[in-house]
């Protein structure tokens, strides 16, 4: 195991709905009647259990009970070994509740902040803005100030987050360390800072080269085999990850984590490349301080080193296990040609969208009859044979179409022009695709939200860039240039037509399907009316010009003004209709976000760090208080009796402990020994394995389930 892997940013098991750990049937009578249900997460490494439990609370009546005013229905206690881990936990919960960002972009931001080492510029600006908001929130809560109020704080979820957080078990020093971690997440030169105080505070933020930090970690891990790291990635995937299989599927089918995605993350730290954008800004919430402890030759503690801020995390085990391997929809596990049709990136994006949908509506997100499983907007290279075939067909069609258009426009010399075009079609298509990609880099297409007030930020930052050469044959590739050119040509023609016709309304809908359809219909109607008026104007002008040129010119001008006057009411009506529909959509979205914040108000998130036994589990107040517990794989030693997890668990409480099934540093035999040692520690700590028939739903083979011994 890597001794420098001192910080953990994600777990290696799927997210667990802690509500499934509650007893059902006759056992439900053992739950506290007038007290909230309590869950304890020991080193979850991220907020996946919290987000899943919040979103799926409607499935469990015990979490939806009406208790006295001011009393939550559920308390989630989260212990992390570092204050930075708690700060990241709160950050992901804040993104989920942020109603100022559309739901689709919110899910993408959450995945990027969770698993990417480098971000889009806009995502980095959002992190900067959210860090400032959380810093102000923590300072206010620590000082006993009233929570944020006002429409802006309500819409951005700050008021709901203030009601959700409980800092009563944190020491003053630990609160200060959380605030210090949030301050480090600021951008060195943010474009969204408008006030002098914010600019001066951000000036103290140190630059952070995540690309160099990632490369340094890889050099430390691989050592003298650094130059052959691609071979090591190939070995880890095919000899360790693939045999472990996919939850709920035959292990012979391999892993749903695609090799292209896994290799790209191992080499560059980008797990979710969801937009055709430039990922060139450091994910500053992945930087933490490393403190070395020193002992003399007798084993006596002789002090600690000064904390050094850097990247000290895992670069071997990918973050796809958290949200990308387990799914409630069986359509994502369809296999064709002995491989999964969907990948972990598709599953992760669907799972986050499903969590948001269920939190906002109280209903599960189900695929309709005949509806295709979700596919991410930009996959990393062709992931199926169907993708390869479609890309080849599109490239051939684009090349032949380019040659035909050039031949038709050449006139008498069309044959020679067609020959030249057919030979150089791919080069022209590549140039067009490159130009289009330069225009679309950085910001992503169709976004209507801004981070803070910096809406005019440049698309591509001047900081780091993922130092990636093009992958070799069979590796991750960008979309085919010819196919990109074939799709870019109609878009360019439509843009030219819309710019030349003043009667067609232009409107940014942010990608919402309803408003997009209404906009297209209104534009078509306005274009038809303008075309009819222009045709009548041209015919009248031509007939008049044959008799009297001067009169014909004046008649054509009059007809043109009449056509514009006739189209003006239609144009204004279309704009008003689209504005009304957009307002209705925004009102509906705001209502859904308000409902999500109301459901989250039934919970309290209690943050804990430091000595767990002294702060929480060893206190008489919490004896037998927790109905369910979870434990991370790097902290299985806390099953020992001295940490008193069994003493804090209620009778019959269940513990979900992450095992080493997906730890790539261990072979299958070593992972089996790890599981056997876990069982030994659990038995000594007062836990016994839960029979397989009683295993709660949604918990995969990546975790062991124990029940408190009587």
From Swiss-Prot:
Any single Gene Ontology cellular-component annotation: cytoplasm
Domain of life: Eukaryota
Main location group: cytoplasm
Regions of compositional bias (Gly residues) in chain numbering: 404-416, 453-462
Coiled-coil annotated spans: none
UniProt keyword Cytoplasm present: yes
Positions with biased composition (Low complexity): 417-438, 478-487
Effects seen without this gene: Nonmotile flagella, with paralyzed half-length flagella and disrupted outer dynein arms assembly.
Membrane in keyword set: no
Any Gene Ontology biological process: axonemal dynein complex assembly
The family this protein is said to belong to: Belongs to the DNAAF3 family.
Job of this protein: Required for the assembly of axonemal inner and outer dynein arms. Involved in preassembly of dyneins into complexes before their transport into cilia.
Protein's name according to its UniProt entry: Dynein axonemal assembly factor 3 homolog
Organism of provenance: Chlamydomonas reinhardtii
Gene: DAB1
């Amino acid at each position: 195991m890597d001794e420098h892997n001192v910080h953990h940013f994600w777990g290696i098991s799927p997210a667990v709905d802690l509500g499934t750990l509650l007893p059902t049937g006759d056992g439900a009578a053992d739950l506290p009647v007038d007290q909230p249900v309590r869950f304890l997460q020991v080193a979850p490494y991220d907020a996946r259990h919290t987000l899943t439990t919040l979103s799926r609370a409607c499935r469990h009546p015990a979490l939806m009970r009406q208790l006295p005013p001011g009393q939550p229905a559920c308390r989630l206690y989260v212990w992390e070994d570092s204050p930075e881990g708690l700060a990241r936990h709160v950050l992901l919960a804040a993104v989920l509740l942020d109603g100022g960002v559309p739901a689709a972009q919110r899910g993408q931001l959450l995945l990027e902040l969770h698993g990417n080492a480098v971000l889009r510029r806009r995502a980095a600006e959002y992190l900067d803005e959210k860090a400032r908001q959380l810093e102000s929130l923590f300072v206010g809560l620590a000082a006993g100030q009233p929570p944020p109020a006002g429409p802006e704080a309500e819409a951005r979820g700050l008021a709901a987050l203030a009601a959700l957080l409980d800092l009563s078990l944190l020491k003053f020093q630990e609160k200060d360390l959380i605030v210090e971690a949030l301050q480090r997440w600021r951008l060195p030169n943010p474009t969204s800072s408008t006030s002098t105080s914010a600019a001066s505070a951000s000036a103290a933020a140190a630059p952070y080269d995540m690309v160099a930090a990632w490369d340094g970690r890889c050099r430390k891990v691989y050592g003298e085999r650094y130059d052959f790291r691609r071979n090591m990635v190939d070995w880890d995937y095919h000899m360790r990850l693939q045999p472990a299989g996919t939850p709920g599927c035959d292990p012979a089918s391999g892993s749903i984590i695609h090799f292209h995605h896994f290799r790209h993350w191992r080499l560059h730290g980008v797990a979710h490349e969801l937009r055709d954008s430039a990922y060139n800004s450091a994910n500053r919430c992945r930087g933490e301080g490393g403190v070395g402890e020193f002992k003399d030759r007798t084993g006596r503690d002789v002090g600690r080193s000064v904390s050094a801020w850097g990247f000290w995390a895992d670069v071997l085990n990918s973050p796809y296990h958290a949200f990308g391997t387990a799914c409630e929809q069986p359509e994502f596990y369809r296999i064709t040609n002995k491989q999964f049709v969907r990948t972990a990136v598709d599953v992760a994006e669907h799972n986050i969208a499903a969590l948001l949908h269920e939190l906002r509506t109280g209903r599960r997100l189900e695929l309709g009859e005949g509806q295709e499983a979700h596919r991410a907007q930009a996959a990393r290279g062709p992931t199926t044979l169907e993708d390869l075939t479609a890309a080849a067909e599109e490239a051939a069609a684009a090349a032949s179409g380019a040659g035909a258009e050039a031949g038709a426009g050449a006139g008498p010399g069309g044959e020679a022009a067609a020959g030249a075009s057919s030979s150089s079609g791919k080069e022209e298509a590549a140039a067009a695709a490159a130009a289009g990609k330069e225009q679309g880099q950085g910001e992503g297409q169709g976004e209507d939200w801004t981070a803070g007030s910096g809406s005019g930020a440049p698309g591509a930052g001047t900081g780091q860039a993922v130092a990636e050469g093009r992958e070799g044959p069979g590796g991750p590739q960008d979309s085919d240039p010819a196919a990109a050119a074939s799709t870019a040509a109609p878009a360019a023609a439509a843009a030219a037509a819309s710019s030349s016709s003043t009667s067609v309304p232009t409107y940014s809908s942010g990608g919402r399907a309803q408003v997009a359809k209404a906009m297209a219909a209104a534009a078509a109607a306005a274009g038809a009316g303008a075309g009819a008026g222009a045709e009548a104007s041209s015919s009248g002008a031509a007939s008049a010009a044959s008799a009297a040129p001067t009169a014909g010119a004046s008649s054509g001008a009059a007809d043109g003004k009449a056509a514009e006057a006739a189209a003006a009411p239609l144009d204004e009506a279309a704009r008003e209709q689209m504005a009304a529909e957009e307002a209705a959509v925004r009102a509906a979205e705001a209502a859904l976000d308000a409902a999500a914040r109301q459901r989250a108000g039934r919970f309290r998130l209690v943050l804990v760090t430091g000595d767990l036994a002294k702060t929480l589990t060893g206190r008489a107040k919490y004896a037998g208080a927790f109905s369910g517990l979870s434990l991370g794989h790097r902290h299985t030693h806390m099953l020992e009796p001295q940490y008193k997890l069994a003493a804090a668990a209620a009778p019959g409480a269940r513990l979900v402990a992450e095992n080493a099934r997906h730890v790539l540093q261990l072979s299958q035999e070593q992972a089996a020994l790890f599981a056997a040692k876990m069982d030994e520690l659990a038995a000594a700590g007062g836990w016994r394995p839960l029979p397989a028939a009683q295993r709660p739903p949604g918990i995969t083979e990546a975790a062991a389930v124990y029940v408190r011994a009587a």
